UniProtKB/Swiss-Prot annotation:
Subunit-structure text: The cytochrome bc1 complex contains 11 subunits: 3 respiratory subunits (MT-CYB, CYC1 and UQCRFS1), 2 core proteins (UQCRC1 and UQCRC2) and 6 low-molecular weight proteins (UQCRH/QCR6, UQCRB/QCR7, UQCRQ/QCR8, UQCR10/QCR9, UQCR11/QCR10 and a cleavage product of UQCRFS1). This cytochrome bc1 complex then forms a dimer.
Endpoints of the signal sequence: none
Family according to the record: Belongs to the cytochrome b family.
Cofactors required: heme b
Protein name: Cytochrome b
Function: Component of the ubiquinol-cytochrome c reductase complex (complex III or cytochrome b-c1 complex) that is part of the mitochondrial respiratory chain. The b-c1 complex mediates electron transfer from ubiquinol to cytochrome c. Contributes to the generation of a proton gradient across the mitochondrial membrane that is then used for ATP synthesis.
Alphabetized SUPFAM superfamilies for the sequence: a domain/subunit of cytochrome bc1 complex (Ubiquinol-cytochrome c reductase), Transmembrane di-heme cytochromes
Gene Ontology cellular component terms for the protein in this record: mitochondrial inner membrane; respiratory chain complex III
Presence of the UniProt keyword Flavoprotein in the record: no
GO aspect biological process, one term: mitochondrial electron transport, ubiquinol to cytochrome c
Cofactor note (record): Binds 2 heme b groups non-covalently.
Pfam families per the UniProt record, alphabetical: Cytochrom_B_C, Cytochrome_B
Database matches in PROSITE patterns: CYTB_CTER (PS51003), CYTB_NTER (PS51002)
Gene that specifies this protein: MT-CYB
Length: 379
């Protein structure tokens, strides 16, 4: 008799995705981040659901309701901090996952990659709207500054901003709709993640060498299930260390002051995971130019398959490209640091140089390095 997991219509889908899935025998821990992102997403939906049970999306009571969750709700403080720091863990895993894709040429799976970029945008939108909900100073001013960027769009900009606000400023209507979108988007992300996985399983996983591994496959279970469990334990360990010891390490103290439209904080800045893009935005003196650079800094990922000129898929055997990749990582860390600094000398010029370097590396230097490496192969 055939095993039920191979015949039952629902079990069969799970079986083909997580149990009998043929996986390359040599994928490293860099391939763990997909499952970790799944865990982060489930954790965020669960903690978010319990927070939504006690939260009120009204400007008069939003801040108080978050305080109420932390003080009066049973274990409300841990749910709140798991949700806030869970977002940070989510983005750490996201950046690692995207970095892995860039390094090992995973972007050559076009559908999987493009849906991944859409997922990145959706997650960033969700995180931004979630940051507005506690209605602290940084929530309010962050929402004001970021939504205002749309006013740079010629002709329709101002109308578009007021349409998103639901009035002439960030107010009650804005908070309510942000809460609605923040609630629905994670479910859209879940659906997209399933499509992401569906397309991945059409081709099978890439591996560190970038060479076809069809001749050497092993079943996903038990080999990679146990490996994913280890990754999950480490993820939860780091998350709980953050939550239980330094819950406000990655937050902004300004957000413990209730939103006040009459008082601007000295330094308006987003959460740490947006700082690199924020630095690119600020490094261009023109408003529309800055907005375009901001969008392009993420949208540039769509171009990666077109910019791939190498005869080899992975960077494993390409030392020049490897060197440029790690310079890009250092550049992004520099941008993240600059994004959190005030707009003054020397931070302005460092930010501008790092922004130029970012686009230069991806659009010109890395494709050039690929061509050089191709020619070196002939020697």
């Amino acid at each position: 008799m055939t095993n039920i997991r191979k015949t039952h219509p629902l079990m069969k889908i799970v079986n083909n995705a997580f149990i009998d899935l043929p996986a390359p025998s040599n994928i490293s821990s860099w391939w763990n981040f997909g499952s970790l992102l799944g865990i982060c997403l489930m954790l965020q939906i669960l903690t978010g659901l319990f927070l939504a049970m006690h939260y009120t999306s009204d400007t008069a009571t939003a801040f108080s309701s978050v305080t109420h969750i932390c003080r009066d709700v049973n274990y409300g403080w841990i749910i709140r901090y798991m949700h806030a720091n869970g977002a940070s863990m989510f983005f750490i895993c996201l950046f690692m996952h995207v970095g892995r894709g860039l390094y090992y040429g995973s972007y050559m799976f076009l559908e999987t990659w493009n849906i991944g970029v859409i997922l990145l945008f959706a997650t960033m939108a969700t995180a931004f709207m979630g940051y507005v909900l506690p209605w602290g100073q940084m929530s309010f001013w962050g929402a004001t500054v970021i939504t205002n960027l749309l006013s740079a769009i010629p002709y329709i900009g101002t109308n578009l901003v007021e349409w998103i606000w639901g009035g002439f400023s960030v107010d009650k209507a804005t908070l309510t709709r942000f809460f609605a979108f923040h609630f629905i988007l994670p479910f859209i992300i879940t659906a997209l993640a399933m499509v992401h996985l569906l397309f991945l399983h059409e081709t099978g996983s890439n591996n560190p060498t970038g060479i076809s591994s069809d001749v050497d496959k092993i079943p996903f279970h038990p080999y990679y299930t146990i490996k994913d469990v280890l990754g999950a334990l480490l993820l939860i360990l780091v998350l709980m260390l953050l939550v239980l010891f330094t819950p406000d390490l990655l937050g902004d103290p300004d957000n413990y002051t209730p939103a006040n439209p009459l008082n601007t904080p000295p330094h308006i800045k987003p959460e740490w995971y947006f700082l690199f893009a924020y630095a690119i935005l600020r490094s261009i003196p023109n408003k529309l130019g800055g907005v375009l650079a901001l969008v392009l800094s993420i949208l540039i990922l769509i171009l990666m398959p077109l910019l791939h000129l190498s005869k080899q898929r992975s960077m494993m055997f390409r030392p020049i490209s490897q060197c440029l990749f790690w310079i890009l990582v250092a550049d992004l860390l520099t941008l993240t640091w600059i994004g959190g600094q005030p707009v003054e000398h020397p931070y302005i010029i460092i930010g501008q140089l790092a922004s130029i370097m970012y686009f230069l590396l991806i659009l010109i230097l890395m494709p050039t390095a690929s061509t050089i490496e191709n020619n070196l192969l002939k020697w």
